[in-house]
Amino acid sequence: MKPLHLKLNNFGPFLKEEIDFSKIDNNELFLISGKTGSGKTMIFDAMTYALFGKASTEQREENDLRSHFADGKQPMSVTFEFQLNHRIYKVHRQGPYIKEGNTTKTNAKFDVFEMVDGKYEIRESKVISGTQFIIELLGVNADQFRQLFILPQGEFKRFLISNSREKQGILRTLFDSEKFEAIREILKEEVKKEKAQIENRYQQIDLLWQEIESFDDDNIKGLLEVATQQIDKLIENIPLLQARSKEILASVNESKETAIKEFEIIEKKTLENNILKDNINQLNKNKIDFVQLKEQQPEIEGIEAKLKLLQDITNLLNYIENREKIETKIANSKKDISKTNNKILNLDCDKRNIDKEKKMLEENGDLIESKISFIDKTRVLFNDINKYQQSYLNIERLRTEGEQLGDELNDLIKGLETVEDSIGNNQSDYEKIIELNNTITNINNEINIIKENEKAKAELDKLLGSKQELENQINEETSILKNLEIKLDRYDKTKLDLNDKESFISEIKSAVNIGDQCPICGNEIQDLGHHIDFDSIAKRQNEIKEIEANIHAIKSNIAVHNSEIKFVNEKISNINIKTQSDFSLEVLNKRLLENENALNNQRDLNKFIEQMKEEKDNLTLQIHNKQLRLNKNESELKLCRDLITEFETLSKYNNITNFEVDYKKYVQDVNQHQELSKEIEDKLMQLSQRKLIEQNNLNHYENQLETYNNDLELNEQSIEMEMSRLNLTDDNDIDEIIAWRGEQEELEQKRDTYKKRYHEFEMEIARLESLTKDKELLDSDKLKDEYELKKGKMNTLIDEYSAVHYQCQNNINKTQSIVSHINYLNQELKDQQEIFQLAEIVSGKNNKNLTLENFVLIYYLDQIIAQANLRLATMSDNRYQLIRREAVSHGLSGLEIDVFDLHSNKSRHISSLSGGETFQSSLALALGLSEIVQQQSGGISLESIFIDEGFGTLDQETLETALDTLLNLKSTGRMVGIISHVSELKNRIPLVLEVKSDQYQSSTRFKRN
């Protein structure tokens, strides 16, 4: 990442500033120079804030970055253009703020652009997604950016002096090693889950084994007595258990099948006897019902005769009904003809009345034409009538307002002259404020040094007292330790190993006699008495253990005290008593008060002058605004006069209200005349159309009447022919037959029902006679008793078989589950053994007592130190090398850095280095860190680096060496920028970015020495 252009608005001391980094030729080394507080570090803050929304140092919050002199209505913003991998990007970030006059905060904004074909195209326009885009683009977050690109003031030696836990946090962020810690936790949880699953499987096997049914069988009970932890024995017994269960099931099944066959035989015999009994009863009943049905035969024959006559007269009845319909149509047609003739007469009367109205309307035509002409000529005036009416209303107001504006303008001019006289030749003196501020700062620094020295001396006395007390304790404990060691050496340790052999010797003595051969040494036994005092041996052994425990406790205490003394020595070496002023605190406080009073007086004077200038600017602005309003008033007055003249010329009216009333009246008269004329024409057209329709209807009705008369004549002829065919003489005969038609459906149903039942009886009697022929009926009660007996026996055996079958199948399922659990358990124990071992190694239970994450971080730290030593050797004239402290204690140590002094051939604590040596080591380590991170990340492009302060602690020769190191970075294609107050750097570095301040804002410019 290489900076190209930086634009700052209301950022720190920069109200509106631009820095063009393209003026730096060929990645030239350049110096950022300026007075204390001028805003040099703010340049780094601006670049970091533009990219990540944070300052270059963690101590600065976003609210601290906004300029105190910024306009309350203007936001703080930074625009940063940079080059990355031969592509150009621009970011614009606006900070959140509460706009003057508002109570709610204006939200932050962030836009990311990329240059494509010479133009910037937007890539992101939201704060969160845009910041994530930048992190992915650069390959680093804000913390990593501070470590790689910007080495902030007071922070870039932090990595050198930090302890293992602090380095772990830094390296974890840079190399994303948290994933290794996550792996350890995952493995830990996985092992925990696996062990729980294994225990659960043992419980499931035991539960299944206890639930297996024994059928009260001695063989199965014997097989089930095996303990479930003996999984191999379970595997052997399961086939035997299944085979015995099948034998029990087969025996029960054989008894069940025999009972089912016996029941089926008696069930079939009972069913056949019941069917035969029902058929005999049904046959007797059907024969009786059939005799009763035959008695209805004469009545059915009479019904059939009536139905035949009704069928023959159907055509005649249809002709009679048709005659009535035709006569009705003829009567309706005559009525329609009469109504239509009356409608035609009424329409002719209406037309004559409308013709009279039309003639009266045409007599007013000339007057209407004159009104139309007036409307056409003045329509444009009426459409914009408000404009002309407003001109009449505004003209007097505008005259009065113009006179008032002229008077106010004269008063403002006089006020401006008064303010200019008050200012006179007075000017703000900010240089004096700067001088007083510097003096006050120096006095405060001297006061703080005196107070810090007093505090440091008190702390030093306290630490020296603690150290002396610890040394006295060590001497006292060392003396006690020597006495205990002397006492321990005096003890006789022989035969102590026989203390636990007393029972063994007693057993041997009880098994042998005097004169026997000893089973231990092979010699003849002369005596069986007691030769060893076991009580004395045990007492001596307890005393030795007590002394050894005391020695161990004292050694532990001495080690703790030595560690505490080492810690106190480190704190003593870190106490720094600075050179202080010769003046007393009383004198310094008096001088401080005098300078603060002088500063306040000068600030009050500057504030008064600035207020007068602000009032002058305000009056100038008011005069300008008044002049604009006066010009606007004159323009509006002229426009009103022109509009009034135009209205009176065209309308011949000098009153807007009269014109509006007459115009609307004329428009109303014209509209009424036109609407009435159109209405008359529409009525005439409608009357003509209606008369034509009624004439057509009349012709249609007359044609219909003629057709109906012809149909009636033909229908009468058909009636006469049909009566002749049926031998009917008059209408009375026809009426009698017609009376039967109401009963026709009932008669037909009665006839059909009789025939259907007659046929059914014949069929059913024949069927039942065939079923009962040559068959004997048995005793039903005896059959029922035998049926119930066989059924009860069968159901009992079926229930027994179902229960045994279910239990056998359940046993099979349980044994299969047990086998499955055992197989899975064996395989699981085999598969998870490697995971158990891996989890212990990753958790630090290994020969180095290191967790996986710390092992990886130590590897990266070794790479960083090796890279840093290449530069440190040059800067320290081959005296110093950084080394990693090898002490390791279960995972969280091993990351401390010491320095190896080649002159003394010994390693030293990093705090023993001088300020200049510490700067050399910090710079070398920071450069090594950035290069290793770049190598590991791959996607990070380090084309620039910026360093803030630190060179003031170096002597001339070391300063030259450090500069040569930074110049070598330039040769690798990296832009290097340095912030420093060291004057020698201005002579060595030709290009300087100078930062100047006038106490309320700063500016920058590049210059060459």
UniProtKB/Swiss-Prot annotation:
Residues at which ATP binds: G34, K35, T36, G37, S38, G39, K40, T41
Keywords: ATP-binding, Coiled coil, DNA damage, DNA recombination, DNA repair, DNA replication, Endonuclease, Exonuclease, Hydrolase, Nuclease, Nucleotide-binding, SOS response
Induction conditions: Induced by ciprofloxacin or mitomycin C in subinhibitory concentration.
Coiled-coil residue windows: 176-364, 392-502, 535-802
Domain of life: Bacteria
Family to which the UniProt record says this protein belongs: Belongs to the SMC family. SbcC subfamily.
Record text on subunit structure and interactions: Heterodimer of SbcC and SbcD.
Protein name (Swiss-Prot/TrEMBL): Nuclease SbcCD subunit C
Organism: Staphylococcus aureus (strain Newman)
